[in-house]
Amino acid sequence: MENKWFLSMVRDDFKGGKINLEKAQKLLEKLDIQCNTIHVKCIFKDNDRLKQGRITIEEFRTIYRIIAHREEIIEIFNAYPENRKILFERNLIDFLTQEQYSLDINRSIVYEIIQKYEPIEEVKQAHQMSFEGFTRDMGSSECLLFNNECGSVYQDMTHPLSDYFISSSHNTYLISDQIMGPSNLWGYVSALVKGCRCLEIDCWDGSQNEPVVYHGYTLTSKLLFKTVIQAIHKYAFITSDYPVVLSLENHCSLSQQEVMADNLQSVFGDALLSDVLDDCPDRLPSPEALKFKILVRNKKIGTLKETHERKGFDKHGQVQECEEEEEAEQEEEENEVRDSEILDILQDDLEKEELKRGVGIKFFKKKKVKIATALSDLVIYTKVEKFRSFHYSRLYQQFNETNSIGETQARKLSKLRASEFILHTRKFITRIYPKATRADSSNFNPQEFWNIGCQMVALNFQTPGLPMDLQNGKFLENGNSGYILKPHFLRDGKSIFNPNKAPINSNPITLTIRLISGIQLPPSYHSSSNKADTLVIIEIFGVPNDQMKQQTRVIKKNAFSPRWNETFTFIIQVPELALIRFVVENQGLITGNEFLGQYTLPVLCMNKGYRRVPLFSKMGESLEPASLFIYVWYIR
């Protein structure tokens, strides 16, 4: 039956005799078989017996079977048909419930699967599935590792903003380094398309009274502020309906601040939040309440009540001024941290505050800040406030005030004062940004700050690598909306949680992964054919006690279909914060291993059963059909 179907599908293509590589590739596409061009070329060459660059129908059949009829899939299929040839509906139901742990499977669902994936018409009409249909089903999105339920907005979006992790970028306008790299609108467009919800805009005075965006005091190129926000307006809600926060680094004169305010209002119109919501005058609203809204994050002078009372009045020429303790220049950050070590000897925050004022240690410098009223009044729920101490915040910080903390200081606080840090992030939105010495736009590991509930962990989206893999993997959850509801123990004021200590009343999971095989993995960059010495590393990222990794053996000279059949077990204490990362490498003897591909996702967003792990490049691009084939099981 399958032979008859195959010949009916390809016979016409061989009427003129043999076919070349290009036609063979098109014929594989016609048969719904995804192929990596390099692998197809090598397999074609190996099966072209006369080495003329053209193959017969029998040679093509061999190529098709090599690519489409994988041994590990044949073994699974053969365990279920009563005659080892055809799956009846009841056989498919057994497979889906026993192996794939699919809930609520019935004949109607099975019928839909057969209709979708079975290519042989007479088998389809009989409500049955051949191996051809089974292998297409196993290679489909239905069998991906990522749970489709996590791929939609499934979380409660009515909590206050502070209850969510918010996808955030740093120096969004840059697409390279921070010294000479170009500023580009693509930085904003790309971040928004990826679901980023907090964008950074460095604003400086430009010529002809037009503010510009660039990395100040460097050779990076400049963009007009108005052009930037026009691009943001166009792409803000393509991927997600939930609010976008514009984090302004404002270095503009008063006159150009007014231009910024005018631009924001004219470009965004009603989408720009310029007053408190009626039901949230004294508390943070929810992402749901702020759908399709743009929020401005900047310094603000005066109260929300005063802002409300000025609404509708012309504010041009009006200036607000205050004296505030401003953070020292970025290059002084390390000195500040060393000075703060003296204060860590004291246990009481109030004593530290008094010491700062009474002892000659200069932590902050006083500065008069002037802000155009027109711009200040556009800041509603995301006012920037200098972080002084947890004690100060508990006493004086207002619900609409947010903090920015550099990675060095934040890391120190997260290690020494984790419980207090969590208490802080339960109430106040906290943004963590890379230290100034990262001139190459490198990133820190964001996991340590998610562990303590920091909402806006800002990364350089333009820089690929492990941190961005974790970022992209984490925000796959909840429909790539850019907002993920924090676990209850990071929201609940009564919960006692410290990521650096053994969790109390945790609900750990035991995760078992059988890494079966690789499918058309990217060949080594150094290979002249389609070969690689492949290995897979499985890593867990989460609280410190959950950080672990395990590795397969190396399969020599096989990137097309390596078989490992190795089983790994992980006990994860805090799965709510855990990410799992699969990394495929080519073993290197001298210069270290070569990265071939990776995939990262939240542990609790994994499907059980036989699953396909899609692989992505270092730049985050899909490497389809390259993937891993695994079996997943976990219990709590």
UniProtKB/Swiss-Prot annotation:
EC number: 3.1.4.11
Subcellular location per the Swiss-Prot or TrEMBL entry: Nucleus; Cytoplasm, Perinuclear region
Domain C2 positions: 491-617
Active site per database record: H170, H215
Positions of the UniProt region annotated as Disordered: 311-338
Single biological process term from Gene Ontology: egg activation
Domain PI-PLC X-box: 155-299
Tissues expressing this chain: Expressed specifically in testis.
EF-hand domain location: 35-70
Domain-related comment: The EF-hand and C2 domains are essential for triggering Ca(2+) oscillating activity and the regulation of PLCZ1 enzyme activity. The X-Y linker region between PI-PLC X-box and Y-box domains may be a target for proteolysis and may play an important regulatory role during fertilization.
Name recorded for this polypeptide: 1-phosphatidylinositol 4,5-bisphosphate phosphodiesterase zeta-1
Lineage start: Eukaryota, Metazoa, Chordata, Craniata, Vertebrata
